[in-house]
């Protein structure tokens, strides 16, 4: 199998937040990446796949049952086309010398990103320049989030950024299947929202709702 051309950013962050609030750190870091890419001109070609995957829109409209590229994350029956896996955000929380810290790794699939940029007519920065821009954007977003949590009472760690996060998750509002890690269906319905702890809300056809943590399920368009 050919190696994937990836850009990797590694950061050591020490946001001044409670350790229990680190649960939202992957989403906040992903927001920083997407904000940076949108500022470069990629607009609606990039987004976040819940909870913190980096995704891109496919070049050709999806056809239910049609052939899909290797990066596609949706079911074969889905017409949802914002399903190319473009990258990952990994966060390892640990005790630092001056309090809670996190080792953050952002990986970006460069061919997928380049395809999204080409569809927008955008020339990407040189590789090292792009790496620095992404790292700076992630660090700035985390600092902003930590400051929000420090200056206003928040019932959950996602609360200060939830509205902006909504706007970056293209799968919201679409029909999805919530699958256990071994592939068993846990819920099927509309991806109707997120709570202040980042849990996905799936509304079934009968109106019943389930709130599902990312540790327990993955969500795919159907």
Which residues make up each language-model segment?
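Beta-rich nucleic-acid/ligand-interaction surfaces
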Residues: 50-58
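Long, positively charged amphipathic alpha-helical accessory segments at protein N-termini or as interdomain linkers
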Residues: 13-45, 57-222
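Generic structural signal marking isolated hydrophobic packing positions
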Residues: 1-4, 53, 70
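Primarily the active-site beta-strand->alpha-helix module of PP2C/PPM metal-dependent phosphatases
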Residues: 1-16
